[in-house]
């Protein structure tokens, strides 16, 4: 029976530390503030927004929601970003992605001030994550993966890791961050010839493809640690599930994150951490 790597204890520890740092900033007259920009009403965006608002409240961060219709124009969205850039009381900006069709996400990302980019949306922040140079913030979910592994004492130095997924939001950043911690990382994707074999060879598997049950019983073995980043709705089961077949993996592997209740809880805590750090930098 696998150890469940639950996100709540990790998030709770981070929240306690961040609340103290937030209180110290407020004593100096600095109110850490995050702008949360949502275009449209995608269910996963709404879910993340609820979690982010709760986390900000617990830490003491002021959250300002900017809610835009799905048919907002490119110019209108860019104007919102410019307002955030020039508002010195706003320290961080979270914008839910992907944006609706018709909007140029790359142009919007490039318009945001990197100092306020708390989820690695801008090219400058991504460069920091992938190169290890600079002061940009890593993607919250990617950093949450490492925070969770560290909290539970999972050894990364020299470990073989299979990262399944190569998106710029999770896959590539988490692979770079794990490599920086001296893990030996294999990035798997749709053209990987034998995905199951690559996963079986790994000590740690990070599943981040956004497709339910991508990692099945043929891809796991004993003594592995499984980090399931996926959040998918299983119509047949009527519940949220990850990218890993949890029922097949949990009796076999050494440790696994549940979905829900795993990485997601830590992601909002990392978001709060980035907002606090941005406020600390801006107030120096």
Regions found by a protein language model. Give the residues of each.
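Rossmann-fold NAD(P)-binding glycine/threonine-rich loop
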Residues: 106-126, 230-283
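Positively charged, low-complexity intrinsically disordered leader regions
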Residues: 1-30
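Anion-binding alpha/beta catalytic cores of soluble intermediary-metabolism enzymes, centered on
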Residues: 92-156, 213
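N-terminal glycine-rich anion-binding loops that anchor highly charged ligand groups
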Residues: 24-34, 40-58
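Short beta-strand elements in bilobed, periplasmic/extracellular small-molecule ligand-binding domains
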Residues: 34, 56-70, 185-187
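Short, well-structured alpha-helical segments in soluble
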Residues: 76-88
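Glycine-rich phosphate/diphosphate-binding loop of Rossmann-like nucleotide-binding domains
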Residues: 39-53, 136-225, 229, 234-250
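Short beta->alpha junction loops
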Residues: 40, 64-74, 190-192
